[in-house]
Swiss-Prot record:
Signal peptide (UniProt feature, chain positions): none
Lineage top rank: taxon: Eukaryota
Ranges for domain Pyrin: 1-94
The name this protein goes by in its record: NACHT, LRR and PYD domains-containing protein 9
Residues annotated as domain NACHT: 150-469
Length: 996
């Protein structure tokens, strides 16, 4: 059954309350009602003559558990027996659900032991009233026929109270105060819990906390839309979630927790169920792409008034509360931090230690780390006063070793064996519990908050010595730094942040003074050596997270340290999405003097929508600091602004920096830029820079006026642009007159990409007139996806005859058809045509024009690369091309035949061409259909000494094991040959300006 109370009273009792005519009408309606619920109807032959008792049995048989009652209650309303409907509903609600009762008991205990709450329940409810009301309705709004169940994300920074709020929500559901008619079952899963589980099905996972007195757990899945999963602690998972991972639909099939969780999140398993999960900023960025039908609720924390009330609840004594709050209120940075309930508790606990000792109130509020240090040292000193110094040091080292081991193994619940292994005795445990650094969680112990565990894990390294043997689980400083700043969203990020701060001379001295014993002095040197080594690694092998690195550096508040580290790196890639991230980035880059390449994605910063002038001025000042790095280095060459949104003032700051004589920018990329408010000034500045050779505006919308202003700048004598990428810029044929003028007047421009712009035939005609002009020096023109037809080929073919400089032409993804390609071939085979590379992928031609293409291959000694992929060439066309390849006059080096619908029958012709054509070094055959015989013929040619091929485009993984083995053996036997998937994808993207 879906809920146990259905066994306590029968359908029969209610059916016997129906009059004869009502019962007959009930049965007639029962023929159709199940269809509305997408259920199979009961056969009328069984139903027609069934008695009340038999109807109740049929309902229970065909619609087990709650389904039978859903059908019955709906029919009571339709036969106007609202009284029975109300009676049944009330009786159902009064019955006890063993699972709900079990959860009520469990979460009531958790709530009462909530370690950092320490406030009356009504006060807590007031602080989360807005979020609670939003959450109580968000699933009700979505519960409509045909609508997908939502994934609701409770979003907020660490310490804002997400876990506490979710536990409260679970308790309110269990009490019957929340979603009473919406969710029959709510399951609370934590990252910590899933870390301790090996392969297991979803139903097995849920069974671990399923009361024995309840109905079989498998029955609850008959109505998945009545199920909610609450997921907490996603950042604590020891495994990563991957968009491309294999998913599972079967909730009874044992799988890894990674697959089970990911299948739930991506709605592959139980797609009708609802999800509620808590994510921090890091978790949001990491898991955003996985979530379906997402709705966000932001947890706001304490208002100013609520912060004051919290102090009064915490201290209880009015004088202490007033003194503590006045101290915090006078320190604006500290008062802001107290918006977070956990940090507010941290502050109050620290101040309480001082008040109890009669000390002057003092807290470091410059940084988060400073606040944690204040808290930790004060509670440690208060709680360990009676301990001898040596024992105090040993106890702290054991605690920090436990924390570090947990961080490296993703362990957040520690059993007695974990404590013993790390030297934490029972008396130690009592001390840490009294200090509220640890708290009990069932039979295990946990740090009072993950941030405290991260803090202690960083402290572990301050106890190490150079000659200490390596720990079996805990990585050394170099490994920690590498893990934290290479790649994205490392679980060790905050441990690294704390360690950076601890390593500074100022903080090391402060810790030693507070603890009363010496700490390691070598950490800072180890950190800098690690980062220096990382800076010299190949970026293709080590992906740096400069967000993580800059967070670490900013937290140190040590300009010399920041300058030393940031100048190790010549190539920086950063994302700025908030004012806080802008502050951190500016604080680091203002010390950067050796930058060579800079990649920036900046959104949600400009324009400033706060309406506050001082906020706008502050942002512009910070942005100026970021831009200062472009002019501070004589070696700065490449600026890549990717998906950046500007307003006029922020663009002006950028322009002023780039116009400085010391700026020697060589390559400027501004892809998918929004709101280029003052593009004329930008064009003037960047194009009058004598060092600038490459300009790329791919994906940035340019109006007709923008395009005209850009072209005017391009014609200026000081302009030295050689490569211009204007793909996907919303340029139309109307702007082609201005572009054509540039082609005639600018002798330095040798490459132009206009891909993905609707130029159409008229626009191409205008360009062709300029290309035929003797003054045009263009060498490469890319016109893929430009919406022109075979009619344009007449003009393009004339360009091929008259233009002496053009060697590369991309016409891909335009509807040229056979007639268009045939027209081009007439010029291609002419001796005066200088074209060396032609791209005709996806141009809608067939094998009909392959005779003309074959003629070109024989007569053109200059054409070296021909890409014909994604056209219906078939085996007949391939035969014509292979015949030409075998001709002694053929000089072709690269041929693209991917996705040309070639069958195994073409392999004989291809094999013959490969062993005959000595110039051919690269062939793309992706998506060719291969059987064993065809593959064998092809492989025999590939290992032949007569074959000159060096690159072959094939996806080996798409074939069966036998063919895969043959292709692998080919690579082993022919060391000069590489077989590669997506052979040209990256190169084509770069040449079109899509990739940088």
């Amino acid at each position: 059954m879906a809920e146990s109370f259905f066994s306590d009273f029968g359908l029969l009792w209610y059916l016997e309350e129906l009059k004869k005519e009502e019962f007959w009408k009930f049965k007639e309606l029962l023929k159709q009602e199940p269809l509305k619920l997408k259920l199979k109807p009961i056969p009328w032959t069984e139903l027609k003559k069934a008695s009340r008792e038999n109807v109740s049995k049929l309902l229970s048989k065909h619609y087990p558990g709650k389904l039978a009652w859903d059908v019955t209650l709906n029919l009571f309303l339709q036969i106007s027996r609202d009284d029975l409907w109300r009676k049944a509903r009330n009786e159902i609600r009064q019955k006890i659900n063993p699972y709900r009762s079990h959860m009520k008991q469990k979460f009531q205990v958790l709530w009462e032991k909530e370690p950092c709450l320490l406030v009356p329940e009504d006060f807590y409810e007031e602080t989360t009233k807005i979020e609670y009301e939003l959450l109580s309705t968000v699933y009700l709004d979505a519960f409509k026929p045909g609508e997908s169940s939502p994934t609701v994300v409770l979003h907020g920074p660490e310490g804002i109270g997400k876990t506490t709020f979710l536990r409260k929500v679970m308790l309110e559901w269990a009490k019957g105060n929340l979603w009473r008619d919406r969710f029959s079952f709510v399951f609370f899963l934590t990252g910590r819990e899933m870390n301790g589980v090996t392969d297991m099905s979803l139903v097995e996972l849920l069974s671990r906390d399923w009361p024995e007195s309840s109905e079989p757990i498998e029955d609850i899945f008959s109505q998945p839309e009545r199920i909610l999963f609450i997921l907490d602690g996603m950042e604590e998972l020891k495994f990563d979630l991957d968009c491309n991972a294999d998913l599972c639909e079967d909730w009874e099939q044992p799988q890894s927790m990674q697959v089970v969780l990911q299948s739930l999140l991506q709605k592959q398993m139980l797609p009708e169920c609802s999800l509620l999960l808590a994510l921090s900023k890091m978790g949001m960025r990491k898991n955003y792409s996985l979530l379906k039908h997402m709705k966000c609720i932001f947890l706001l924390g304490f208002s100013e008034h609520q912060r004051k009330l919290y102090f009064s609840h915490y201290f209880q004594e009015k004088d202490a509360s007033s003194r503590a709050f006045s101290f915090v209120r006078e320190k604006s940075s500290l008062f802001v931090l107290c918006q977070s309930p956990f940090l507010c508790w941290l502050v109050c606990t620290s101040l309480k230690c001082q008040l109890e000792k009669g000390e002057d109130l003092e807290l470091d509020s410059e940084t988060i780390t400073g606040l944690y240090v204040s808290f930790f040292t004060k509670v440690f000193r208060s709680g360990s006063e009676t301990c001898p110094l040596k024992q105090r040091r040993a106890r702290l080292k054991s605690l920090c070793t436990l924390a570090a081991e947990g961080m490296w193994t993703c362990t957040f619940l520690f059993c007695p064996e974990d404590l013993r292994r790390n030297g934490v005795s029972e008396s130690d445990t009592s001390m840490w519990l009294d200090m509220k650094l640890l708290h009990r969680s069932g039979d295990c112990l946990a740090f009072i908050h993950t941030c405290i565990q991260e803090f202690c894990a960083a402290m572990f390294y301050m106890f190490t010595r150079p000659k200490d043997p390596p720990h079996s689980v805990i990585g050394n400083v170099t490994q920690l730094i590498t893990r934290a700043v290479s790649g994205h969203y490392s679980r060790l990020s905050w441990t690294a942040v704390f360690l950076f701060v601890f390593s500074t001379e100022r903080m090391t001295h402060r810790l030693e003074t507070s603890f009363g014993f010496p700490l390691s002095k070598e950490i800072k040197q180890e950190i800098t050596q690690s980062l220096d080594t990382l800076s010299q690694c190949d970026p293709n092998n080590v992906m740096m997270s400069f967000q993580a690195l800059f967070n670490c550096l900013f937290e140190t508040q040590d300009p010399e340290f920041v300058a030393q580290v940031v100048n190790f790196f010549k190539d920086i890639d950063i994302y700025i999405g908030t004012k806080e991230e802008l502050i951190i980035c500016a604080a680091c880059l203002r010390h950067c003097h050796s930058l060579q390449k800079f990649h920036l994605c900046m959104e949600h910063v400009f324009p400033d929508e706060s309406g506050c002038i001082s906020n706008t001025i502050e942002k512009l000042t910070l942005w100026r600091d970021v831009c200062s790095a472009f002019a501070a280095s004589e070696d700065f060459e490449i600026l890549n602004l990717d998906n950046c949104r500007f307003d006029e003032p922020s663009l002006a700051v950028l322009c002023r920096t780039l116009s400085q004589p010391v700026c020697k920018l060589r390559k400027f990329v501004c892809n998918f830029a929004s709101n280029l408010a003052n593009s004329l000034e930008l064009f003037k500045v960047i194009l009058h820079n004598p060092h600038l050779k490459h300009l790329n505006f791919y994906g940035s919308s340019l109006s007709h006026m923008d395009a005209r202003q850009l072209c005017e700048a391009l014609k200026h004598p000081m302009c030295n642009i050689e490569e211009l990428m204007l793909g996907k810029c919303d340029i139309t044929g109307e702007a082609c007159e201005d572009i054509a003028s540039v082609l005639v007047h600018n002798k330095k421009l040798n490459l132009l990409s206009l891909c993905e712009n609707a130029l159409k035939d008229d626009g191409v005609l205008v360009l062709c007139e300029a290309l035929k002009n003797p003054d045009c020096a263009l060498e490469a023109l890319l016109l893929s996806h430009c919406c022109f037809s075979s009619a344009a080929c007449d003009h393009l073919s004339q360009v091929l005859l008259y233009n002496r400089s053009l060697t590369f032409l991309d016409l891909g993804s335009n509807v040229l058809k056979d007639e268009g390609v045939t027209t081009l071939c007439e010029s291609l085979k002419h001796p005066s045509c200088n074209l060396q590379e032609l791209w005709l992928m996806n141009c809608y031609f067939t094998s009909v024009c392959c005779v003309d293409i074959a003629t070109v291959l024989i007569h053109s000694e200059k054409l070296k690369t021909l890409k014909l992929g994604n056209n219906k060439i078939y085996d007949a066309g391939a035969k014509q091309l292979c015949k030409a390849l075998k001709h002694p006059k053929c000089k072709l080096e690269n041929l693209g035949l991917e996705a040309c619908e070639l069958s195994p029958a073409s392999c004989e012709d291809l094999a013959s061409a490969l062993t005959t054509c000595k110039s051919l070094t690269c062939v793309n055959l992706e998506w060719i259909t291969l059987d064993y015989d065809g593959a064998a013929v092809l492989c025999e040619a590939l290992v032949s000494l007569e074959c000159s091929l060096q690159l072959l485009g094939l996806n080996k993984s798409s074939y069966d094991e036998e063919i895969k083995m043959m292709l692998t053996q080919v690579e082993e036997m022919n060391p000069n040959l590489i077989i590669s998937h997506h052979l040209w994808t990256d190169d084509e993207g770069r040449r079109r300006g899509i990739l940088v």
